[in-house]
Swiss-Prot record:
This is Protein OPG209. It comes from the Viruses. InterPro entries: Orthopox_C13, Poxvirus_TNF-rcpt-II_C. Coiled coil: none annotated. Pfam families: CrmD_SECRET. Keywords: Early protein. Belongs to the orthopoxvirus OPG209 protein family. The keyword Kinase does not apply.
Length: 190
């Protein structure tokens, strides 16, 4: 009986190795269901950085300060539209980082995903995946994601906006780690 089981197992293994694996092929996305404008806005609460450096390499974009690093990355064959306009500014203890690009003739024709990482320079084991607060599903793309590592910031917000400038269709994802402290939610007087 044991030999019959071994033979059946051997036949199953060899037949599954000999047969090709089914790998689904995703067809190109039509221009009316694709986007040609990308904007990633990261807002940081309790931040007043003045000096920063920008690095972009192989669909990975970073803004680096003395306290934290923000990274926006895409899948290896991902974003066809490079994020060329990258800037940071701080006002009233809220810092904002903007990664943006728009093209008249380049449309995102394949499935892609954008990920955002906000990491404090001070060593920490705290890791928070930001919660999706609002999201629309207009274009064919994978869901966006973001995480925050550390405790150098009180609140982190990420808004990813995709737009087709010819049709006017807009798709966005809004993520956060919880929100503003009660002092700011309730107003100065409480």
């Amino acid at each position: 009986m044991m030999i019959y089981g071994l033979i059946a197992c051997l036949i199953f293994v060899t037949s599954s190795i000999a047969s090709p694996l089914y790998i689904p092929v995703i067809p190109p996305i039509s221009e009316d269901k694709s986007f040609n404008s990308v904007e990633v806005l990261v807002s940081l609460f309790r931040d007043d950085q003045k000096d920063y450096t920008v690095t972009s390499q192989f669909n990975n974009y970073t803004i680096d300060t003395k306290d934290w690093t923000i990274g926006v990355l895409s899948t290896p064959d991902g974003l066809d539209i490079p994020l060329t306009n990258i800037t940071y500014w701080s006002r009233f203890t809220i810092g904002r980082a903007l990664f943006k690009s728009e093209s008249e003739d380049i449309f995102q024709k394949k499935m892609s995903i954008l990920g955002v990482s906000i990491e404090c320079k001070k060593s920490s084991t705290l890791l928070t995946f930001l919660t999706v607060r609002k999201m629309t599903r207009v274009f064919n793309k994978f869901p966006d994601m973001a995480y925050y590592r550390g405790d150098c910031l009180k609140a982190v917000y990420v808004t990813m906006t995709y737009k087709n400038t010819k049709t006017g269709e807009t798709d966005y994802t809004y993520l956060s780690n919880g929100g503003l402290p009660a002092y700011y939610r309730n107003g100065v007087d409480g």
